[in-house]
Regions:
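Hydrophobic ligand-binding cavity/cleft-lining segments
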Residues: 1-45
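Residue-level preference for beta-strand/loop junctions
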Residues: 3-5, 49-51, 61, 89, ...
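Short, surface-exposed coil-to-beta transition loops
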Residues: 6-8, 63-67, 89-94
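Glycine-rich portal/gate segments that line the openings of hydrophobic small-molecule binding cavities
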Residues: 12, 42-86
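A short, structured loop/turn motif at beta-sheet edges
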Residues: 14-18, 70-75, 96-106
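Hydrophobic pocket/interface hotspot
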Residues: 20-24, 31, 55, 69, ...
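Short alpha-helical
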Residues: 29, 64, 115
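Beta-strand/loop substructures that line and gate deep hydrophobic ligand-binding cavities in soluble
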Residues: 82-134
Length: 135
């Protein structure tokens, strides 16, 4: 099996960990509210706020992806996997939260992924990092 590529970026958010956790995990199916590239999202399995829940996200009229919650440590870490990205065989994302102040949190986002063909990973990394800072 080919090695997964890794991309990490840290984003400072002007909100406490509780507010961020509420949006990331307890409102998992509502990513379209804050992610500008998502037209729609809906829960297809389980319930918001539980491990194993699944959502489908629609990007434009032709692309959709399915995401599953793999792991959740309340107020600290959320891990998901995704399927349906063109040219991507495997992708997993981990969101780690660190409180910086009363209304300031660092969100460390780590993606691990494998593309087909492998050369696509180089171009994908640049695009992913840029898009993350627009959310």
């Amino acid at each position: 099996m080919a090695k997964l590529k890794s991309l990490q970026t840290d984003i400072r958010v002007n909100a406490n960990r509780e507010k961020i956790w509420e949006v990331l995990f307890n409102q998992f199916s509502e990513i379209n509210i804050y992610h500008p590239g998502t037209n729609d999202s809906r829960l297809t399995k389980g319930k918001n706020g539980e491990i194993g829940c699944q959502r489908v996200c629609q990007f434009g009229s032709k692309m959709s992806i399915t995401e599953n919650v793999l792991e959740a440590i309340p107020l600290e870490k959320l891990a998901i996997d995704a399927n349906g990205f063109p040219g991507v065989k495997d992708i997993m994302a981990t969101f780690s939260l660190r409180q910086l102040g009363a209304e300031s949190t660092e969100v460390a986002i780590t993606f691990r992924y494998r593309t087909i063909p492998a050369i696509l990973a180089m171009f994908m990394s640049r695009s992913m990092k840029k898009n993350l800072h627009q959310v």
